[in-house]
Structure formats: C-alpha cells, structure tokens
C-alpha cells in the first residue's frame, strides 16, 4: 500500500511538472520579449500568448474527459485521482487565456470588452465556456461533494457543454485552416460518444436483468 501511495505521489508530481511546463516556458519567453525586445513569441506576442494558453486549456479539458474512458478500458481506478487536478489546470489555463485577452489585447477597456463579448460569436461562446467552468472549479473539493450530494454530479455534467463550446470557440476563431480544431472536435466526439454508448449499454443490461423470466409451459 505504501509503495502504491509513493508511486501515485510520483505520478502526480510528474503530471504537475508536465502541465506547468508550457506556462513556465511562456512566462520565460514573455520576460525575454518584455525585457530584451526579443522575438521569442513571434511577430505578435499577445496573439501567441492567447493561442497557446487557449490551446492548452482545450487539451487539458479533453484529457480530463478522457480519464473516465481510460479507467473503464484499463480497470485502473487510480486514474480518477488525476481528474480533479487536470480539471483545475484546465480552469487555470482558461483563466490565463481570458486574462491575456482582457488585459493584453483589450487593455482593460471594459466598454470594449462587453461589446466584443456581445458582437463576436467566438468570444461569446468562449466566455460562456469559462463562466461555466467557474462553478466546477469552486465545487471541486470533497467538502462541496458532500454538501451537494447527487446535485454535485449533475452540476459537473456541465463539462460536456463546456467541451462543445470550447471546440466551437476554436473552430470559429480559425479563419482558414480548420484541421486542428477539426482534430479536437473529433476527439471530443469520440469521448462523448463513448459515454453515450456506455450509458445505453448499462440501460440494456439493467432492462435485461429486470425483465421477468419467461413463463414455463405447463
């Protein structure tokens, strides 16, 4: 048991390091641009920051959604221990993405911010996805699970429309080459399709077991 706990801690440490590496690299490159005027972030540093943080938010969202199918396929219940961590990192990257847009792109002009959210559909769906992530991040603790009971599971089903909104945000944002958003849309479709299939299979199994036995001829 102790050896298993140590291996889980080591795995979590590795996941923390892997997930924080992109933001650490981005921070280092931003510092180079800010202090030295380098081109580490390309010709448009703000757009690059927004793109990378948004992309990692979407990737981590899909990885979080993949935890349950992976557990069901492999039988490794320990994978569930990583789901909350990855979900919170999804919210972190999404929040950095939104902050970069508000403060680096729009420079905190609130009137323009509200106009952009209302007028541009891809911003509307992206902002909506972030808003829906907020209650999931707040209620991700064991304490909230106990308080909300069954409603906790119902609330956290918001992750599915959030995934759809996030992919739609990326799809609408891309102007020409849609191969990358199409790839993420395909992954999301597989993950959601798996859940639908498992639920239908469970219902069929339950119906089969609850059906009365056939009458024996007399």
Curated annotation (Swiss-Prot):
The keyword Signal does not apply. Pfam families: Ferric_reduct. It is found in: Cell inner membrane. Its cofactor is FMN; heme b. One of its GO terms (cellular component) is plasma membrane. One of its GO terms (biological process) is protein repair. Binds 1 FMN per subunit. Keywords: Cell inner membrane, Cell membrane, Electron transport, Flavoprotein, FMN, Heme, Iron, Membrane, Metal-binding, Transmembrane, Transmembrane helix, Transport. InterPro entries: Fe3_Rdtase_TM_dom, MsrQ-like. The chain crosses the membrane at residues 14-34, 60-80, 86-106, 121-141, 155-175. It comes from the Bacteria. Signal peptide: none annotated. One of its GO terms (molecular function) is metal ion binding. It is a multi-pass membrane protein. Heterodimer of a catalytic subunit (MsrP) and a heme-binding subunit (MsrQ). Belongs to the MsrQ family. Part of the MsrPQ system that repairs oxidized periplasmic proteins containing methionine sulfoxide residues (Met-O), using respiratory chain electrons. Thus protects these proteins from oxidative-stress damage caused by reactive species of oxygen and chlorine generated by the host defense mechanisms. MsrPQ is essential for the maintenance of envelope integrity under bleach stress, rescuing a wide series of structurally unrelated periplasmic proteins from methionine oxidation. This is Protein-methionine-sulfoxide reductase heme-binding subunit MsrQ.
């Amino acid at each position: 048991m102790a050896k298993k706990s140590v291996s889980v801690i080591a795995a979590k440490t590795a996941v923390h390091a892997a997930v924080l590496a992109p933001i650490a690299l981005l921070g280092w490159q931003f510092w180079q641009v800010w202090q030295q005027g380098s081109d580490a972030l390309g010709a448009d540093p703000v757009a690059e920051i927004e793109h990378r943080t948004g992309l990692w938010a979407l990737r981590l969202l899909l990885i979080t959604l993949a935890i349950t199918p992976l557990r069901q396929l492999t039988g490794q219940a320990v994978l569930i221990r990583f789901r909350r961590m990855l979900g919170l990192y999804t919210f972190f990257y999404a929040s950095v993405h939104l902050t970069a847009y508000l403060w680096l792109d729009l420079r905190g002009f609130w009137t323009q911010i509200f106009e952009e959210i209302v007028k541009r559909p891809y911003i509307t769906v992206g902002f909506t996805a972030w808003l829906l992530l907020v209650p999931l991040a707040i209620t991700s603790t064991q304490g909230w699970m106990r308080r909300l009971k069954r409603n906790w599971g119902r609330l956290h089903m918001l992750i599915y429309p959030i995934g759809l909104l996030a992919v739609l945000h990326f799809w609408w944002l891309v102007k020409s080459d849609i191969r990358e958003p199409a790839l993420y849309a395909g992954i999301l479709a597989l993950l959601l399709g798996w859940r639908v299939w498992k639920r239908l299979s469970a219902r069929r199994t339950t119906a089969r077991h609850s059906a009365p036995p056939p009458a024996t001829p007399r």
